[in-house]
Design a protein with these regions (language model features):
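Catalytic Walker B motif of ABC-type/P-loop ATPase nucleotide-binding domains
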Residues: 42-45
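ABC ATPase "signature
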Residues: 100-101
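Hydrophobic anchor residue at the start of the ABC signature
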Residues: 31, 59
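Conserved catalytic motifs of ABC-family nucleotide-binding domains
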Residues: 38
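Conserved ABC ATPase signature
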Residues: 17-21
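Conserved ABC ATPase "signature" region
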Residues: 1-13
Length: 138
């Protein structure tokens, strides 16, 4: 507990009830708790939502550290720059997996004459537009 408190900057709020904490500290606490058990697989649902940019960066350093130790980490995010940190991405749209692959694979799938080298966000938007066109009669 003390190692995680230090790693996530939680010592200053150790005596506070969790319902009194700002969202950023709640997110830090949740990630620290999940890492204390040294899981083989870690599911993180929008772990950086509601945190400041510095804390967001720190979260990804912790996540990458876990991956380097052999932990499988699955992350849901609406931040496309965060999706690009991942080895593999699954694009879920309207409850369906419509594309999956490495960030480079998804960008290549969505490249066109107008956007020969799309950003991750442009790729996601293009893949969704393509899916909508293919499934417009459903």
């Amino acid at each position: 507990i003390s190692r995680m408190s230090e790693a996530f900057g939680l010592k200053s709020i150790a005596s506070h009830a969790t319902d009194e904490l700002p969202l950023g500290f709640k997110q830090r606490l949740a990630l620290a708790c999940s890492l204390m058990h040294e899981p083989d697989i870690l599911f993180l649902d929008e772990p950086t939502s509601g945190v400041d940019p510095l804390t967001r960066r720190e979260f990804w350093l912790h996540i990458n550290s876990m991956v380097e130790k052999g932990v499988t980490v699955m992350v849901t995010t609406h931040f496309m720059d965060e999706a690009e940190y991942c080895d593999r991405i699954g694009l879920v749209y309207r409850g369906k997996l419509i594309a999956s692959g490495t960030p480079d694979d998804l960008k290549a799938q969505s490249a066109n004459d107008e956007q020969p080298d799309p950003t991750m966000e442009q790729a996601f938007i293009q893949l969704i537009h393509d899916w909508d066109k293919e499934h417009s009669n459903e």
